[in-house]
A protein has these predicted regions:
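TOPRIM fold recognition
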Residues: 1-4, 146
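The Walker A/P-loop phosphate-binding site
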Residues: 6-110
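Conserved inter-motif catalytic segment of the P-loop NTP-binding fold
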Residues: 85-148
Length: 148
């Protein structure tokens, strides 16, 4: 049973969700395909999404730029190695802290690291600069963008 609306689930529905979500040591689970590695360590599998959090000025943006460039090029960039299926190559990059000029610089950096021209948008990279919106609007925009 997949929850598809924002209604508060009943106690019965919650019990079903808990049963579906229970992980057992006795069950064999299918491993998702590995699509992103740093050197020999797995950091991403198909079907997952990630957020980068950390202290201010801790190089989060540069790190995520390198990961995004690797995914965009579907190759190795600064020790990050990507191997995405052809039909799973769209990258959604959401920045909620930086203004549009800074986001544009990050976008150009990603394109450059991926070996692409930094003066042409890529069909496989969607960058959203959401700083100007309220937290509630950001949440709604993120939810909608994930359906792209």
């Amino acid at each position: 049973m997949e929850k598809t609306n924002n209604n508060i689930p009943s106690a019965e529905e919650l019990a079903i969700y808990i049963k579906e979500a229970t992980v057992s040591v006795n069950t064999k689970y299918e491993q998702s395909p590995v699509v992103l590695m740093v050197d020999d360590s797995i950091i991403g599998t198909l079907g997952n999404f990630s957020a980068s959090i950390g202290k201010a000025k801790s190089k989060k943006t540069f790190n995520v730029s390198a990961i995004a460039a690797s995914a965009l090029a579907n190759s190795t960039v600064l020790h990050y190695r990507s191997s995405f299926p052809e039909n799973k190559r769209t990258i959604l990059y959401i920045d909620t802290e930086q203004g549009e000029p800074h986001c544009q610089k990050v976008l150009q950096r990603i394109l450059c690291l991926a070996g692409l021209p930094k003066n042409a948008d890529s069909d496989n990279l969607i960058m959203l600069g959401l700083r100007k919106y309220s937290p509630e609007m950001i949440f709604d925009l993120e939810q909608d963008a994930l359906c792209i």
